[in-house]
Amino acid sequence: MRYSVFLTVVVFLLAVSCQSAASTERVPNLASVQAAAAEVGKEGLLFGKHADRPVPVASITKLMTALVVVESGQDMDEWLTFEKRHVEAAANAWSRIRVGSQLRRRDVLRIALMSSENFAAYTLARTYPGGFDGFVAEMNAKAKALGMLQTRFVDPTGLSTGNVSTAADLVILARAALKHPEIREASTTGYYRAEFRKPRYSLSFGNTNALVHRDSWGVSLSKTGYLTEAGRCLVMVSEMNGTPVITVLLDSLGTRSPMGDAGRIKRWLATGQPGSVAPAAKRYAQEKNSALMAAEAEQSRTTTASSQ
């Protein structure tokens, strides 16, 4: 009798243990093709989804642009002139800012981050002591120094598909950016009215991350990005169950998909439930992942053949 009771208890404990392990091992279902999440105060990742795959990161690039600016020691109150670009702008680089007008560097940084203003990011690079090329070189040097070993930048705006990184590398970048109050404050400004001079005029800008406007999220760092090749992207630090969490989401279909993924991660951390993704977004992620895996396999075959 005692042996029978003992076996019953053992079986019950094993079942509970297996159920608990299964719930903790499950990861959230996401619309994003690549993703990672990490607690701000701890090393390592809470989870990763193709987190080491280098892909175009679009305007997430501007987080590194901001890091170079604030760590350069330049006068943040200096008036910068928006001069005509020395390189041809991409087709989607249209800006409301008038060529020849001026704005203080801290406000140029603000609209580059919160509203992803490309002319602003370009101007920050052009007015760097080493000029545009020196700025891009410093972006890459800083990435290397931080240990972002699969990251490469070719411009400060993110309009080039040559700007590539991984979800894991961008967690590192978020940690570095989070140390600077100027970046935190500028990236999470909800709305801002910039006052230009020469000529004097003003423009209103809004944050491209809808979650910034929700107090319940406690967003302390934010940057969105989009290119056709990169999909919808988001890097964010927000409160999740009382803990500041870095969320990196790369390449999803819809405008709101990254915000939806952030919500799924938040619920997963609270409940262990993986959640569900809309069929169209799920299909996009599966097709994109299959294409990337095929490209990776082809590259591996080419590399192997060339080394023989």
Question: How does the language model describe each region?
Answer:
Residues 26-33, 105-106, 130-307:
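Penicillin-recognizing serine hydrolase domain
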Residues 1-4:
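Positively charged n-region of N-terminal signal peptides that target proteins for export
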Residues 6, 22, 63, 300-302:
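A detector of low-complexity, intrinsically disordered, Ser/Thr/Gly/Pro/Ala-rich segments
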Residues 6-16:
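Bacterial N-terminal signal peptides
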